[in-house]
């Protein structure tokens, strides 16, 4: 049988509430859509979204309109991932596991620099 060793997480939480998805990211490096959504929502709720977006590179995104037509847009990768998560009916876009993790890291870093928890 193997041994289980307890340790501590040195990275501080960035959200002002306990979230299992944040613990999983910090402890095990698990990038989840739940954590991405929570970080995105926190940035929006704090009124930081415009400032965050202004610092991010833009990527192509194909928007699906209600009438079934599409249009090309340039949005942040974070917003692209958010749209893909929230609009599964739009199958014109995709993201990788690495892109999800990178987006989470960018949001965590942004929150750290703007937060006073």
Language-model-detected regions and their locations in the chain:
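C-terminal lobe/lid and adjacent interdomain/linker elements of RecA-like ASCE P-loop ATPase modules
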Residues: 1-67, 112
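Short, well-structured alpha-helical interface segments that form or flank functional binding sites
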Residues: 14, 18, 22, 73, ...
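A diffuse structural propensity rather than consistent per-protein peaks
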Residues: 19, 95-96
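Amphipathic alpha-helical interaction surfaces
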Residues: 29, 84, 88-91, 106-113
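Histidine-centered, metal-coordinating catalytic motifs and their short helical/loop contexts
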Residues: 70-94
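Amphipathic, Lys/Arg-enriched alpha-helical patches that create a basic surface
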Residues: 97-117
């Amino acid at each position: 049988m193997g041994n289980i060793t307890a340790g501590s997480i040195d990275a501080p939480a960035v959200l002002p509430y306990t979230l299992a998805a944040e613990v999983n990211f910090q402890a095990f490096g698990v990038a989840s859509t739940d954590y991405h959504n929570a970080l995105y929502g926190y940035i929006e709720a704090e009124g930081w979204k415009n400032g965050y977006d202004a610092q991010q590179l833009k990527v192509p995104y194909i928007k699906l309109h209600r009438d079934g037509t599409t249009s090309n847009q340039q949005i942040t990768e974070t917003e692209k991932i958010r749209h893909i998560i929230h609009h599964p009916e739009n199958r014109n876009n995709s993201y990788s596991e690495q892109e999800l993790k990178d987006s989470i890291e960018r949001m965590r870093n942004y929150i750290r620099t703007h937060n006073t928890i």
